[in-house]
Design a protein with these regions (language model features):
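Extracellular receptor-binding modules and their adjoining Ser/Thr/Gly/Asp/Asn-rich linkers
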Residues: 1-160
Length: 160
């Protein structure tokens, strides 16, 4: 991928799924964030975003992604899974783990799925407790020390 690209699902989901994506290669040594946006039940947009202090442009990279139906349930082996969307900014936001995950300290995946403002951001997990996890969107600081950021939509996957 290079620039903004549209990803279409082979078949539409019943509702907008949780989308999780990453850059899978290192063809260009310059650090880059993968931004996901415009998620619908039919697909989403991706774009690589370089550090603020870097020169524009980035080499072609391979992107990996997975889309998981929003909601929750139990797998055949008894594992609890929860996929949902939340809204998070640069202030630590506690998010409840939900029934079946309390006290289990689950596996957590997350992805920022909006682009609000032009600064590169990443989703961070902090303060895992028996009943909640703290989420925060952090800006990188290559050009300036300011890290305040507006609310972004995030997809979250929890599984025990």
């Amino acid at each position: 991928a290079q620039g903004q690209e549209e990803v279409k699902f082979a078949a539409p989901f019943a509702q907008t799924p949780g989308v999780f994506a990453s850059v899978a290669t290192e063809n260009d040594p310059q650090p880059v964030n993968l931004r996901v946006s415009d998620c619908t039940n039919a697909g989403f947009q991706t774009a690589m975003q370089s550090e603020e202090a870097s020169t524009p442009g980035h080499g072609v990279e391979r992107l990996n992604w997975v889309a998981i139906q929003s909601g929750g349930g139990t797998t055949s082996d008894g594992s609890t899974i929860r996929v949902f969307e939340s809204s998070v900014n640069s202030t630590l936001t506690p998010v409840p783990l939900g029934e079946g995950l309390r006290g289990r300290f689950p596996t957590v995946l997350g992805q920022v799925v909006s682009v609000v403002g032009g600064d590169p951001v990443e989703l961070r997990f902090r303060d895992l407790r028996a009943d909640s996890i703290g989420l925060v969107v952090e800006e990188e600081q290559s050009r300036d020390p300011e890290v305040g950021h507006a609310f972004e939509k995030v997809s979250v996957f929890l599984a025990d």
